[in-house]
Amino acid sequence: MSFSLSWTLNGSGGNCDNPLWDDVEIKLLALRNIHGTITLDIHDNDTGPQMLQIRAEAGNYLVMLGEIVSDDYEVRAYYNKKSTAEMVCILGDYWPNNQIITDFSFVTQVISEFFHTGNVQKNLLS
């Protein structure tokens, strides 16, 4: 599987092709408790998962997986049915609190699974 990694961390960014897990992990750890994004794109998939993006600000994380299903582009995200629908601002956009993750180890688990398998279990991102 061929990936590209792109990021913005506190206003400065970059990208690289064919990252190793260490490259992804370094950017992910840098994202912890600051504002920015990390995106992993899969280059050789015509259907199924295409990309995983993490948006972060103030210890709040929004994780989205984009995929092609039956010629439609769909986005899967974390959903906490026990949380409120109150809106949280991340990078200037407002998102329902029930889609926000505050557990950094969960964010790490999701991006690791995507990097190593090319997908994320639907019980993690629905």
Label each PLM-derived region with a short phrase.
Residues 1-33, 44-49, 60, 64-126:
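Acidic, proline/glycine-rich low-complexity IDRs
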Residues 36-42:
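A short, Trp-centered hydrophobic/proline-enriched beta-strand micro-motif
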